[in-house]
Amino acid sequence: MELEQLLNSVPEYAKDLKLNMGGVLRQTELTEQQAWGTAVACAIAARNPQLRESVLGEAAKHLNEQALFAAKAAASVMGMNNIFYRFRHLSTNPKYGAMPARLRMQVIAKHGSDPIDFELWCLAVSAMNGCGVCVDSHENVLREKGVSEEAVLAAIRIASTIHGLAAILDVEADPIA
């Protein structure tokens, strides 16, 4: 389903999310690649099949193959890392923090896309997944590389809007809810 068609199916009570989606993808703080890569990574992380397929379909018009690969890779590796590092952060046992991760994360260095864009996508997914350690880490890297706080927040607007839309689409797809 086309993204516009999917957004038009959003119920009236979630109209703000529908309208926000149109706006957050056109924020001037982000390049087109940054915005659509963020949308792809977050739509994958949101785990709603309709939203994921609609965003991927539209994003293919705005991203080259390498950027699309990198956005998918960001969602993939953050899906793993956010759980691992959030556990280490939340656990009161200090031994876990000293133990090695022993998880492959080579795609972080070998995604083939713009490193700042990839970092931004990782940040957005980390925010969705609630990993404070990862959010701080990615935000610090972005700020050190000169990315503005406005651009960081623009990516988070995309993440929050996609997260909200996924929740509504899940509810509307389940007649029991």
Curated annotation (Swiss-Prot):
Domain of life of the organism encoding this protein: Bacteria
Disulfide bond recorded as keyword: yes
Catalytic reaction list: N(6)-[(R)-dihydrolipoyl]-L-lysyl-[lipoyl-carrier protein] + a hydroperoxide = N(6)-[(R)-lipoyl]-L-lysyl-[lipoyl-carrier protein] + an alcohol + H2O
A GO term for molecular function: peroxiredoxin activity
An example Gene Ontology biological process: cell redox homeostasis
UniProt keyword annotations, A-Z: Antioxidant, Disulfide bond, Oxidoreductase, Peroxidase, Redox-active center
Documented EC number(s): 1.11.1.28
Active site: C131 (proton donor), C134 (cysteine sulfenic acid (-soh) intermediate)
Enzyme class of the recorded protein, top EC level: oxidoreductase
Cystine residue pairs: C131-C134
A Pfam family recorded for this sequence: CMD
HAMAP family the record matches: AhpD
NCBIfam families cross-referenced by the UniProt entry: ahpD, ahpD_dom
Function: Antioxidant protein with alkyl hydroperoxidase activity. Required for the reduction of the AhpC active site cysteine residues and for the regeneration of the AhpC enzyme activity.
PANTHER family (UniProt xref): ALKYL HYDROPEROXIDE REDUCTASE AHPD (PTHR33930:SF7)
Family of the protein in this entry: Belongs to the AhpD family.
Name this protein carries in UniProt: Alkyl hydroperoxide reductase AhpD
Organism of provenance: Solibacter usitatus (strain Ellin6076)
